[in-house]
UniProtKB/Swiss-Prot annotation:
Heterodimer of subunits alpha and beta; disulfide-linked. SUPFAM superfamilies: C-type lectin-like. Disulfide bonds join C6-C17, C39-C136, C111-C128. Keywords: Disulfide bond, Hemostasis impairing toxin, Platelet aggregation inhibiting toxin, Secreted, Toxin. The keyword Secreted applies. This is Snaclec GPIB-binding protein subunit alpha. Residues 13-137 form the C-type lectin domain.
Length: 142
């Protein structure tokens, strides 16, 4: 009973597979140019990356930093603020709860990205329609 391996061009960390995509997409504008939708099409259970510990944050930063173009400053992650009847709830796009936080306090834009000047370790909220590279994540099937 061999454990499932991530596809050859994906990186493995614990029970997940990760891949950094250079192309610039919006977070989720319900169009064909949409990072969350793109991730969901890459693998069953695929989403924009959720980051649930310092260790995972380090792993994702190391995946992004050597591979990102010089002119690119933000990388989408799967966190978005959703307004529901005046109550804001932050949720990862894979529906995991936000128990680990690494925010740079900013404005009230709705979608979160890793920022280059923070070494791709801190989360900043920026406009969801901006085109940015992104990281996808899915759990390895058993």
């Amino acid at each position: 009973d061999t454990p499932f391996e991530c596809p050859s061009d994906w990186s493995t960390h614990r029970q997940y597979c990760y891949k950094f995509f250079q192309q610039k997409e919006s977070w989720d504008d319900r169009s064909e140019y949409d990072a969350e939708r793109f991730c969901s099409e890459q693998a069953k259970g695929g989403h924009l990356v959720s980051i649930e510990s310092d260790e995972e944050a380090d792993f994702v930063a190391q995946l992004v930093a050597p591979n990102i173009g010089k002119s690119k400053y933000y990388v989408w992650i799967g966190l978005r603020i959703e307004n529901k009847k005046q109550q804001c709830s932050s949720k990862w796009s894979d529906y995991s709860s936000v128990s680990y936080e690494n925010l740079v306090r900013g404005n009230v834009k709705k979608c979160f990205a890793l920022e280059k000047k923070q070494g791709f370790r801190k989360w900043v909220n920026i406009d969801c329609v901006e085109g940015n590279p992104f990281v996808c994540k899915f759990i390895r099937p058993r």
